[in-house]
Amino acid sequence: MKRTTLSLFAGAAALAAVTGFAAVSAPGDTGAETVEPAARLPVERTSLLCPAPSASDLAETTYTSFTPVTEGAEEKGTATLTAAADGAGAEAGKGGEDAESGKDGEDAKDGEEGKDGKDGKDGEPVLRPGAPGTPVTGTASGADAPALTGTAEGSHAPGWTVQQTTEVAAGTGRGLLGLNCTAPDTEFWFPGASTASGRTDYVHLTNPDDSAAVVDIELYGKDGVLKSTVGEGVTVPPGGGESLLLSTLTDVEQTDVTVHVNVRSGRLGAAVQALDDKTGGDWLTAAADPAGELVVPGIPADATAVRLMLFTPGGSDADLKVRLASPSGAITPAGHETVHVKAGMTTGVDLGEVTRGEAGSLVLTPTSGSVPVVAAVRVVRGEGGEQESAFIPASDPVGARATAAENRAKGTTLSVTAPDRTAKVEVTASAGTEGGTTATKTFTIEGGTTQNVEVPVPAGLKGTYALTVETVSGGPVYAARTLTGEDEDVASFTVQPLPDDRGTVSVPKAEQNLSVLQQPPA
């Protein structure tokens, strides 16, 4: 997002410099022109990347694609989601052989086995998205489903969202695993990973481009960096999807690990698949960029255990206030009023049953000076042998609009929080994949609270549907959507934060002024 955003702004600035100018004058200038607000225009192209869903033969995966209707978007467009190129273990300097022939090599066959899968075979799209406003689904079975790369253009681009949901009936990582497929970027932070016994965590890398990408993978534990040369200079082939087992990158067992993925050349999609022998598994997606204030939205009301993981990448320690935004207001968890995060070290804090049967979101703010941190929580639901876990990273706000592609008539919970000011949001349910008409509701979220809102359901719903959340006034607001499994005897679930869906971009207001090209040199 960093490189793409900077390029976009640079291009807009260059365009303004050549064909016009945004009126900017110092205070007191005579003849100063009024600065007009930037216009928000629909994007014309969107790329998304989905990791290989599972190495389990029991895996059943559903992909749901949805583009919301966006005012001002082009009338025509296309979108496709196809299998990434074959891959059998990332190449990494001296560690390349180990990454290919060890345990990771065996389990990183997703890309290679994709050749024989019924979905994406011979370059055929896994699904072909329909018109904006109606979600479309595709499926894959077993361990041979590959990573996917997708591109949407024209009318299909603004806010294009793809949800990948996998159900695994048994074994390590059983349960419900879900994520929103991500846009390519150049840097990712994953607090919440682990190299402890009983955990099997992989970092998945997907390259959308026609040239190889080179990436460094750094691990940080409770005492600082976990030294390893295996994660340096990992090469991901053009259009390929790869996975690396974290325990092959270091021989140190750590309960809480922060993974830093830094792309030297090219761009990638990245996600961590965290599988637990006892509490199932889920995807750990990238946390919001390091910041002094963070929000972790949508902790389930019936969570039986919540563990907060934090990391500060700078050279200064961070001290943070910990608050839970509940339906009745901000609450300070007993015994965890503040947390101290040492520079370059991962800190884990057990918050227990912090939500106590109510909707909740964690709000982290500095006690004094602001120091950038990243954060995520691991949530456990259920009791005994029926427990399952999921991860919620700190998120960016909803912004203009956020989108959740896959929702069901039962088992969908939408959590919305306004950590500071009261906000009004509009929630719209799309038509269903097999039928139904849209429905909309508006909610007011009081400042400092979190509400599990009563989501609208399409009239005559058949299949699954999409939700959009739009900020009407106030805010900022943060949101997360929880899906629960259909088997009521097992606490399977997955949570996806809902940041802005990148459907529109701010373009400075410019006016024609060719005289800037005729001014004599200084």
Regions found by a protein language model. Give the residues of each.
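Hydrophobic alpha-helical membrane segments, chiefly transmembrane helices and signal peptide h-regions
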Residues: 6-26, 259, 267-270, 324, ...
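Extracytoplasmic low-complexity, Pro/Thr/Ser/Ala/Gly-rich segments
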Residues: 25-148, 152-156, 500-522
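C-terminal soluble interaction/assembly domains
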Residues: 428-487
